[in-house]
Amino acid sequence: MAVFPLSAKHRKYALRALAVSIILVSAAYIALTERTERVRPQRVEQNLPPLSWGGSGVQTAYWVQEAVQPGDSLADVLARSGMARDEIARITEKYGGEADLRHLRADQSVHVLVGGDGGAREVQFFTDEDGERNLVALEKKGGIWRRSASEADMKVLPTLRSVVVKTSARGSLARAEVPVEIRESLSGIFAGRFSLDGLKEGDAVRLIYDSLYFHGQQVAAGDILAAEVVKGGTRHQAFYYRSDKEGGGGGNYYDEDGRVLQEKGGFNIEPLVYTRISSPFGYRMHPILHTWRLHTGIDYAAPQGTPVRASADGVITFKGRKGGYGNAVMIRHANGVETLYAHLSAFSQAQGNVRGGEVIGFVGSTGRSTGPHLHYEARINGQPVNPVSVALPTPELTQADKAAFAAQKQKADALLARLRGIPVTVSQSD
């Protein structure tokens, strides 16, 4: 069990006390060694009371982290963390039947916030159902445990990686602990120029991407901010840029001169005429479940019945009801890219081979939805990736955007320069 105090002030005092203790112990040791012949050693045994949250004298709130063991239930983990039995009973009686609280993996951790009075205030942990990571957050208010709608304490840090290809690019990136979603996004970003699988021994990949941390543990990867691939001595670069007018709708990738990086394998058609982007790709608070989860696509708000079009040529591989997606269509495209269109009110007559721009359905609110919109996903080899990197048209930069892009690129260039000449590196920068 690990305990993490929240107060920086208390940590400072603790470090000072530790330093003083080391000095005193060292002095005592020196004094004792001068009198070893006069002092007879004695063995003293004393039974200590069990660890308890109450009456510890700790006045500040702190997080307790408890690792899940094979076969553990949530009640087992909470009991081992020191939570009172009656509190555990209140949680399990109210939420014990919910799937996300029943299925715990042995490689995850449960975090409990302990208040200054020694009582539990919050419980947080991630679940992974069918590749979708969800944050389960419970909080106690007015003596009642309920699902928390407060923001999770997640920190985003840019992560730097420099990898020299040995046998294969994907294998070398995996050994350097580059997440699979980053590997597949990288493949999509440069798909119009070369295949990631075509890199040879001695080629290099340098990456800057966002990583999300929860209580000090990396839980997910965000967008690739900059990428540099040296293939056969030729350098290829991609830079992520989002203009102010795009708001929360996500950005796009451009080369070092601010030009559109690629044609994205024929993805030059928006899937619909939309009002606004209501939810981008990435972590968000789910409006119905009130849990933080990885939103694996982009939501486009649009009126009921708005035509939805295939974003590129492909083959319809699924058309029908698909759980929380409601009415959905899936299309397989070239280069291992697959797109999904969800919450449709109805389907068109399209089936089999479809052309880019062909109507495949109509906007609706079927499945788990709060109102009419299109949920649009892109996957590469089954792995969800940000659609802007592979499956949406990229707009040309305006003159105003070019100046902002140049300033942003300059910062990324400085970080990439640090990585050149380093075979494998891992670092974060605040």
Curated annotation (Swiss-Prot):
Post-translational modification: Likely to be synthesized as a proenzyme. The cleavage of the N-terminal domain is probably required for the activation of the enzyme.
A GO term from the CC aspect: cell outer membrane
Keywords associated with the record: Cell outer membrane, Cell wall biogenesis/degradation, Fimbrium biogenesis, Hydrolase, Membrane, Metal-binding, Metalloprotease, Protease, Zinc, Zymogen
GO terms for biological process, alphabetical: cell wall organization; proteolysis
Domain of life assignment: Bacteria
Enzyme Commission designation: 3.4.17.-, 3.4.24.-
Top EC category: hydrolase
Molecular function GO labels: metal ion binding; metalloendopeptidase activity
Similarity comment: Belongs to the peptidase M23B family.
Known role: Has both endopeptidase and DD-carboxypeptidase activities. Degrades cell wall peptidoglycan (PG) to allow consummate expression of pili.
Name of the protein in question: DD-carboxypeptidase/endopeptidase Mpg
Species this protein is from: Neisseria meningitidis serogroup B (strain ATCC 13091 / M2091)
Upper lineage: Bacteria, Pseudomonadati, Pseudomonadota, Betaproteobacteria, Neisseriales
